[in-house]
């Protein structure tokens, strides 16, 4: 590796300590005269960083300040976030990351170590990845997006790079994935966002999105080159559009080590929540009847993961399918509707199974007809869970599970406080964005957040350690159970899922469980004698 000295050290975020360099380090690294004489510990630096963040009035400004630190001093960045994880995780990732994405081109202040690829230049993939990995250690994890399906805010093209940088930051904060072992990648395939196409400051290619054969060939080349340059790498696909996300996952999931957080991750978090809910209601997952409001990538992914769990509990494939009701913009998805995705077709109901005069367009009508035990929201439609719909859930169930998990808060189907109030405290609530505790009738209800950060960092940790040839549904199921088992549910008002303050503990448990499962399935490409020891040894700690 190249030996850095002087200004090169200060310009390298992995090496730079700012005022944290000791006198001996300043002499040996050629830093004499390049820094103020004061030497500060990382603890002293963190206090100053946090005080500065606290003075900033809005979350986007806080995000930009912290990302500036990320670009200058990676160690101090991770040390600071780790000290204030509950407060700062929503700043560096969801929900604030949505604002950062929308304002990325206007606030551009460097690439943050990301690799920028273009569908127009398939021949440059290898050169670009080599450049991005230069001066890093072994690349064990790549998070890649094409920016078409960013959170709940849609197509933001190359601005989606903020998502992959933020996602990898969460991997490090939560699971201790070494930042020198990861690579953020954004694929510029154009954009269908008219606002970006007409924005003179937009940094991406200003043409409509490329689809079809040209796009598919590019993805294929990217997958091949990534695995050639970085053998045993985990490829995490993030925020691809509905038309491509599932196709990519289905094409490659049995060929390489890959994971799609939007399809699989959200589903695993719902399995975790359902496992916890099963403990509270004394009703196993296989006995639940589920309405999913939102038939996109996340909604179908949730159905798939819970379906797998139901089959594990003894239901046949057909029996499990019959437990799901998926609602999209035209109402309940039935087999007489046109232009359904392959995922939607799988869960489409026979229209003839319902009375001819029955309305299947409104959520309330579907709830009244099928009487579900569980309602999950992935639509991104704010306020979609009406008071009438919620009260029907409470009428039909002693403890209805209601989970509006769309992000950010402005796109959530309902607020936790409304759900508790409308059900007279009966609802078991999980939300997508952080929710404050709700006080109702003398009880404080702690609201679980279906934060995928409880899953994917630990999953990645276990995968990086075991290096399996692929990521299986059984590994995801083991991860879901590990998350659910961490929470004490005996107290009234207890959160269904662990809080983000337990991210490190959760990630370790998930990592160990996934590593064990990889070995159990015989898919590990790394010889491991003790999963727990191997996982703990892999964890990076941010410190000078």
Spans of features found by a protein language model:
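Generic secondary-structure signature for well-ordered alpha-helical cores
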Residues: 27, 31-34, 55, 106-109, ...
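Flexible, glycine/charged-enriched surface loops at secondary-structure junctions
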Residues: 232-238, 284-288, 313-322, 488-498, ...
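Long hydrophobic segments that form regular secondary structure
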Residues: 359-425, 467
């Amino acid at each position: 590796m190249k030996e850095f000295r002087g200004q090169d050290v200060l310009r390298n975020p992995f090496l730079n300590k700012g005022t944290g360099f000791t006198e001996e380090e300043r002499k040996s690294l050629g830093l004499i005269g390049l820094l103020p004489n004061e030497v500060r510990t990382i603890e002293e630096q963190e206090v100053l960083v946090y005080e500065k963040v606290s003075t900033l009035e809005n979350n986007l400004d806080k995000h930009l300040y912290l990302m500036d630190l990320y670009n200058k001093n990676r160690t101090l960045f991770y040390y600071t976030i780790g000290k204030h994880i509950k407060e700062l995780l929503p700043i560096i990732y969801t929900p604030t990351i949505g604002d950062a994405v929308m304002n990325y081109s206007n606030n551009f202040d460097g690439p943050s170590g990301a690799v920028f690829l273009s569908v127009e230049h398939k021949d440059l993939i290898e050169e670009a990845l080599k450049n991005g990995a230069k001066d890093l250690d072994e690349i064990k994890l790549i998070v890649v997006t094409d920016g078409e399906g960013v959170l709940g805010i849609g197509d933001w093209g190359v601005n989606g790079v903020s998502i992959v940088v933020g996602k990898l930051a969460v991997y490090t904060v939560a699971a201790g994935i070494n930042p020198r072992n990861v690579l953020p990648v954004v694929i510029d395939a154009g954009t269908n966002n008219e606002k970006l196409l007409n924005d003179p400051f937009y940094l991406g290619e200003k043409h409509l999105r490329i689809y079809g054969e040209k796009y598919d060939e590019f993805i294929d080349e990217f997958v091949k080159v990534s695995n050639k340059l970085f053998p045993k790498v985990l490829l995490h696909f993030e925020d691809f559009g509905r038309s491509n996300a599932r196709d990519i996952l289905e094409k490659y999931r049995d060929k390489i080590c890959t994971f799609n957080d939007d399809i699989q991750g959200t589903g695993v978090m719902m399995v975790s929540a359902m496992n916890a809910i099963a403990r509270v209601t004394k009703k196993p997952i296989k006995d639940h009847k589920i309405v999913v409001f939102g038939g996109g990538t996340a909604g179908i992914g949730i159905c798939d993961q819970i379906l797998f769990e139901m089959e594990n509990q003894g239901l046949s494939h057909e029996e499990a399918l019959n437990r799901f009701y998926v609602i999209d913009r035209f109402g309940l998805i039935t087999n007489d509707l046109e232009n359904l995705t392959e995922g939607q077709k799988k869960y489409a109901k026979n229209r003839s199974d319902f009375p001819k005069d029955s309305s299947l367009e409104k959520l309330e009508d579907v709830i009244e007809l099928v009487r579900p035990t569980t309602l999950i929201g992935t639509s991104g439609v704010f306020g979609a869970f009406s008071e009438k719909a919620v009260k029907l859930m409470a009428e039909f169930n002693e403890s209805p599970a209601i989970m509006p998990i769309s992000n950010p808060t402005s796109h959530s189907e309902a607020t936790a406080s409304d759900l508790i109030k409308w059900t007279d405290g009966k609802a078991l609530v999980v939300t997508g964005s952080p929710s404050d505790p709700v006080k109702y009738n003398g009880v404080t209800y702690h609201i679980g957040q279906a934060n995928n950060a409880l899953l994917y960092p630990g999953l990645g940790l276990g995968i990086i350690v075991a290096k399996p040839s692929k990521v299986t549904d059984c590994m995801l199921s083991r991860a879901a159970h590990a998350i659910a088992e961490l929470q004490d549910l005996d107290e009234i008002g207890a959160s269904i899922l662990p809080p983000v303050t337990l991210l490190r503990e959760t990630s370790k448990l998930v990592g160990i469980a996934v590593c064990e499962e990889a070995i159990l399935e015989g898919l590990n490409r790394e010889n491991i004698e003790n999963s727990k020891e191997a996982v703990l040894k892999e964890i990076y700690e941010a410190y000078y």
